[in-house]
Regions:
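Domain-terminus/edge residues, biased toward the C-terminal soluble/receptor-binding domains
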Residues: 49-53, 57, 61-202
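Active-site-adjacent loops and short helices of periplasmic peptidoglycan-processing enzymes
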Residues: 1-70, 74
Length: 202
């Protein structure tokens, strides 16, 4: 409280250490919390993530909030097309400035980045309702895979993701897909509703 922060720093804190307060600040930077949630849900509709209703900006449990592994894959695919997102998500460590004289260290909780060749990024999470969750992306030999996990036993999600990615790369071109991810709708949400990375917010 009483400090201002760069939007880019808030995104980095959100994606590296799951800073729930950063998610709240980013949502409110759209004008209000309700406006921020409207932007999030509009983006979900644009991506045809129809299993998703966001109630909290940080994903903490709330009545009527829900998503699916399928929708998380849609979000990850979209993130892979956004250089700014990848920059924040692939940050392994850094400093988060608080005021003019103080800073705290950031270390990316996604250990896949440092331990899996070809890892592109991802996000680890946990809530009481969802259990341990994980979204991970990796690329090898020109082939990109996304893996999504929900309700994992604690501390097993990274190893489970590695096993799924290993299998996916091993069978590339040898198996038939059971389906395809829906593409985004043609109309896009207004980017003016989103805070610019260079902006400072209180």
């Amino acid at each position: 409280r009483g400090h201002s922060y760069k939007v880019s720093d808030l995104f980095t804190a959100l994606l590296t250490i799951s800073a729930n307060d950063a998610a709240m600040a980013l949502a409110q930077a759209t004008g209000s919390l309700s406006q921020g949630m409207a932007v999030i849900n509009a983006e979900a509709r644009h991506l045809q993530a129809d299993d998703t209703v966001a109630v909290t900006p940080n994903g903490l449990d709330a009545p009527s909030q829900h998503t699916s592994a399928y929708d998380l894959a849609l979000f990850a695919r979209q993130g892979l097309q956004m250089p700014a997102f990848l920059k924040y998500d692939q940050t392994t460590s850094g400093q988060f400035r608080i005021g003019k004289k103080k800073s705290v260290g950031l270390w990316n909780q996604n250990s896949l980045l440092a331990t899996y060749p070809g890892a592109l990024g991802g996000k680890i999470g946990w809530t009481s309702a969802a259990g341990a969750t994980y979204v991970g992306m990796a690329k090898r030999g020109g082939h990109t895979l996304v893996v999504t996990l929900l309700h994992c036993p604690a501390l097993t999600e990274i190893n489970a993701a590695k096993q799924l990615l290993n299998w996916g790369f091993k069978v590339d071109g040898k198996v038939s897909p059971v389906g395809t991810l829906a593409g985004p709708q043609s109309a896009t949400p207004s980017p003016a509703a989103l805070p610019a990375p260079s902006r400072t917010v209180a």
